[in-house]
Amino acid sequence: MSSYANHQALAGLTLGKSTDYRDTYDASLLQGVPRSLNRDPLGLKADNLPFHGTDIWTLYELSWLNAKGLPQVAVGHVELDYTSVNLIESKSFKLYLNSFNQTRFNNWDEVRQTLERDLSTCAQGKVSVALYRLDELEGQPIGHFNGTCIDDQDITIDNYEFTTDYLENATSGEKVVEETLVSHLLKSNCLITHQPDWGSIQIQYRGRQIDREKLLRYLVSFRHHNEFHEQCVERIFNDLLRFCQPEKLSVYARYTRRGGLDINPWRSNSDFVPSTTRLVRQ
């Protein structure tokens, strides 16, 4: 269990509790979680973070009424900056989006501006929102993470408790390599409910070569670990930077959707540009 799982900042969350669904607009449904909860134990300070990045959300269940009462549907794309004070708690995000269902808006841009304003207020940081009509996305191909998949290794694993031990002495040689490694075996669990979160992860780095077996064992050790998606990605970035000391590092995870939302955080200390096309499990 994470050291902050019982922190008072989490006590008021609707996550893990029985809730009523509202279908008329209510911005108060949104709830934030301080990023400092997991950053402080990692020694990460807001004024000296070793990375930049965003939390990319895809909104698949977004609907409202136009001025004449005709339902509208869209797919939303949200990017929440890493410098925001809070991350957005996903169940509250779902409940908030449901509150649009029977609410009339004059036009699509009013919806976009409302989302951007409310999310920025909750996160206490920069948020950008784009809305797409369905015909804009139809025929869009399934994407994939570029890189070498490290999953098909003939190894025995019997420990699924999180540990950084596997990353000790995980680099070899003095030669500097530049490579991208991919795993689809990332599984962590919700900090509050302990429900499973399934993801694929892409690790791009420049530095001494990282042992792929040790890296895979480390990633598999998240299997019983309880943390939010964004927190896991920052933990992985921080651990790799600390133990493997690459010159450049980017960590990008795309998680499967839950409640009509998927969360795709990335962190980097280089000029990394993430692909935003959904993966096969999304």
Swiss-Prot record:
GO terms for molecular function: preQ1 synthase activity. NADPH binds at residues 90-91, 258-259. Its EC number is 1.7.1.13. It comes from the Bacteria. It is found in: Cytoplasm. The active site is at 190 (thioimide intermediate), 197 (proton donor). Keywords: Cytoplasm, NADP, Oxidoreductase, Queuosine biosynthesis. One of its GO terms (cellular component) is cytoplasm. Catalyzes the NADPH-dependent reduction of 7-cyano-7-deazaguanine (preQ0) to 7-aminomethyl-7-deazaguanine (preQ1). This is NADPH-dependent 7-cyano-7-deazaguanine reductase. It comes from Escherichia coli O1:K1 / APEC. The lineage of its organism: Bacteria, Pseudomonadati, Pseudomonadota, Gammaproteobacteria, Enterobacterales.
